Design a protein with these regions (language model features):
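Short, charged/polar "capping" segments at the starts of alpha-helices
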Residues: 34-40
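Active-site Tyr-X1-5-Lys
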Residues: 137-150
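Conserved glycine-rich Rossmann-like NAD(P)H-binding loop of the short-chain dehydrogenase/reductase
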Residues: 26-32
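Conserved Rossmann-fold NAD(P)-dependent oxidoreductase catalytic core, especially the SDR/UDP-sugar
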Residues: 101-139
Length: 150
């Protein structure tokens, strides 16, 4: 399969991409990091995949590939910095900006499957963690809800 992973250089994305590449899927990683050496420091497993026809880095300066699946894990890390109101705005906008970009790039050639990662933080404490669970009212829940509403 031809797969675009947004946020493929992040914590979960690195593990996912490693697995997809091992399964011989054609993996495209969209990242906002423009410096390839920085990406390789974060995701050392990618060093062996450069030059492989099954792997490609994509950023704003590349043409987005035709793909069968988009997996969107993108967004600023919640754990990186202190959570202030400004930081929460950055976290939300980083996720919505990527969604808007993907919608624009793929509006005329939608993939068969679009997987959007969210978080269990959308649910109230002790709620059932699926689409039937009650939503929380904290900042994490508001971010998740805004993404899912998009």
């Amino acid at each position: 399969m031809r797969i675009l992973v947004c946020g493929g250089s992040g914590f979960i994305g690195r593990a996912l991409c490693r697995n997809l590449i091992a399964q011989r899927h054609q993996v495209n990683i969209y990242t906002h990091i423009h410096d390839v050496t920085k990406i390789l420091k974060k995701a050392t497993f990618l060093k062996n995949t450069f030059g492989s026809p099954n792997f490609r880095l994509v950023n704003l300066y590349n043409e987005f590939p035709n793909v069968d699946v988009i997996i969107n894990l993108s967004g600023e890390s919640i754990a990186k910095k202190k959570l202030t109101h400004k930081r929460m705005d950055e976290i939300l906008s980083s996720r919505l900006d990527t969604l808007n970009l993907l919608f624009e790039e793929y509006k005329l050639r939608a993939p068969k499957l679009f997987i959007q990662a969210s978080a269990t933080g959308i649910y109230k404490d002790k709620a059932q963690c699926d689409e039937t669970g009650k939503l929380g009212d904290n900042d994490y829940a508001k971010i998740c809800k805004a993404i899912e509403d998009k």
